[in-house]
Each structure stands twice: as structure tokens, then as C-alpha cells.
Amino acid sequence: MRFVDRCRLKVIAGDGGNGAIAFRREKYIPFGGPAGGDGGRGGDVVFVGDGGLSTLLDFTYARTLEADRGEHGMGSDCHGRAGADRVEKLPVGTQIFDAESGELLADVTEHGQRVIVARGGKGGRGNLHFKSPHDRAPRRAEPGEPGEARELRLELKVLADVGLLGFPNAGKSTFVAAVSAARPKIGDYPFTTLTPILGMVEIGGGVRAGGSSFVIADIPGLVPGASEGVGLGIQFLRHVERTRALLHLVTLDPGEGREPLADYRALRKELKKFSPEIAERPEIVVLTKADLTEVRDAYPKLKARFAKAKVKLHLISAATGEGVPELVRELAALARKREEPAEQDG
């Protein structure tokens, strides 16, 4: 399925039905009073968060979402039926903006969260409402009110506890596959991962077994200049915004001119350009591919160089599992630590 994380569309709520002009027509009552019913209310356009969705692809095909109008009122004081709501599911993590003003209308962060983005118009009143001592047979009724219409911009930002960063081919996809049930595409060429990949990491059997879990997001490969649109560009840097902690993978690859500390500094620079606040979040820095002899031999010197830069460098191998359990526990602790203040504030 193609990953789409932003789109624009129009939403049109239903118009209210018109009130009716009608009179009682009963035997022996030749001049019955007013009996016009009210028009029905127009339907709303509603978005509902769905944790099972991961793309806005469907909205690239349906550029206009329209709810039903209310039925008109009828005689015998019969009211029109309300128009049906137009209900559409959205991926959890979607932000809804007014396309013209740029105002954030809603942030869909929970499964089942409902957001009314366009309200249906009220139904008009029938002539029964206009009867008075001075006018016992009113011949007027109200038209229904128009439903709201607006242009929206939808932006999806993945919801994850830990954001996984690193140059292309730093081993991010291999790590996600090793610690979760996610199966990202893995290859030996740049930008193997072209969309954010979410993986659920379970500890001690997961929540159901009395353990814990957290979500990790493999953000597509960042390169110098990403904050200005180079490579896959800023389109995916946005997905780091909701993470609580960062896991930064570096690798030793002299054949491609990769130097771990230089790579780390380059991507830290991009993060700071994009968002100084995100750059200050807790992070763990890891040298991958410990199963390779050249990596293991170089680790002591690299660790010392990172230490001079006041950065602790871990060593793991996603292929053999070396260092992975300890790293997962440390990430889980970071995710919990960041979550606790938010819960206390709430």
C-alpha cells in the first residue's frame, strides 16, 4: 500500500430541510389550522480515529466528502428526517487543519476519537410555529440552514515512543525487524525504507503478560540537508515530532566514506535545524554490526572519541542479538520516564 501522509480535501455538511406550509384537512373542519412540519437537520461530516490505519491514501481518491441533507417538513405536523452523517476513518496521529487559515482544528491521537469537521444545517420551522392570534393561517415557513463547508488539510505524524534515526543503511530496518514483529524491507542500498515503519517492542511477554511495551518508528534515512528538502527531505522529519526518545544508529563503513562520529554530528545538526526542542530529547547512540570484526576492533577507539564529545556509545549486533536486550530495556525506561510527567500533569 502506498504511504500518503498529507492531503487536501473539501468537506460539505448537509443542508437542513425546509419547513413545510400545510394545513389540517379533516372532515367537518374546512378551515383547519397550520400543520406544516419542521425540516430535518443536515448530516455532519465526522472523522473517527482508527489505530489500524497507517496512510491517508483513501483521501487522495475522494477529494470531496459530503453529508446528506435533511428531508423537508411535511403536512400533518410531520417533521423531515435528519440527514445521515458522513463518517470517515482516519489514522491515529492525523492532524486536521483549516486549509485557508492554517488553524489546527483537531489532533486525532486516540482510537475511536470523533471529530466533527463540518456541522449540518438546522432544519427550517414549519408554518405551525408562526400561528398567532393575529394570523391563524400563516403561509410562511423557514428554509433550512446551509451546512458548513470548508477546505481541510490533513497531516499524518506517526505516533511512537522512540524515533529511530541514522544514515541510510545504518541498520535501522534490521534492528526493527529484530526487536518487533514489523517486517520492513531490508537491502544494501540507500533509502531501502521509503515510509515510516512502526514496530511494537514487547518486554516480558508484553502488557497482557504483565510486562511492558513501547512503539518504535524507523524514520526513513536522513542525510545532510534533509531539513531543506534534500534526499527524502523534511516530509519525514515531521514524524520525529511525537516521539519521546531517540535511538541514533551509526555504522562503520569506510568503503562508503562513513565515519560514525561525523555522521552523528551531521544528523544532529539537521535535527537542530528542524526543531531545537526535538534535538534536546533523550537519546541513545549505538554502533551497529558488532558481528563484523572490523567494527568490534574499532569500537574501543570510537567509544573514546564519542566520550570526548560527551556522548555514550553502545555496541550491538541486530544479526546476532548481542547487546539488544539491554538496549531494549534502556529504551523502555526512557519511554516510561518521558510518559510519567505527562500523566501527572493530566
Swiss-Prot record:
GO BP annotations listed: ribosome biogenesis
Instruction: Please give the CDD domains that the UniProt record associates with this protein.
Output: Obg (cd01898)
Give the binding site residues for GTP: 166-173, 191-195, 218-221, 288-291, 317-319
Q: What is its EC number?
A: 3.6.5.-
Q: Which InterPro entries match?
A: G_OBG, GTP-bd, GTP-bd_Obg/CgtA, GTP1-OBG_CS, GTP1_OBG_dom, GTP1_OBG_dom_sf, OBG_GTPase, P-loop_NTPase
Basic and acidic residues bias spans: 132-147
**EC supergroup of this enzyme:** hydrolase
Q: Which cofactor does it need?
A: Mg(2+)
Which is a Gene Ontology cellular component entry for this protein? cytoplasm
Q: Which family does it belong to?
A: Belongs to the TRAFAC class OBG-HflX-like GTPase superfamily. OBG GTPase family.
Name of the featured protein:
GTPase Obg
- Which organism encodes this protein? Sorangium cellulosum (strain So ce56) (Polyangium cellulosum (strain So ce56))
